[in-house]
């Protein structure tokens, strides 16, 4: 049995257990080929470049992107009552932000399609693409800064920080080809 087959077995047994418990409508779980993550990181970086470039001229891009994230499948409550995990489904975010991110949407969808070997999701998670990423639903600059320290990429996480009023590093501006962004 290889890793993908084992992952499928884990997903299917998890689904069966959730079905028995009556919670299968809420589930989402996927098997990811980690050798494909560089393409996902590149797609995420490119999405960050696109939105930062647009923010260079118009900071309302942040509000538009936030609306896309708010409408997207997200995980862990992300509200004051339940707390915040600040995790958004990458595929659904890209789908919602298509008008803003343009061709980055197709790049994200391709990277996800290549990397997600198997996935399950219940009726309440029908937009789950198989992979979630950080998005600051709570607007906490401290947690956003901590995320950026461990992020595998720099530009998307810099955009998230910028969108909640934090500074963008000169390195991220340089990498994205942006001279300066407007104040949020």
Regions from the language model: what does each represent?
Residues 1-184:
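Terminal, contiguous helix-loop blocks that mediate binding/assembly
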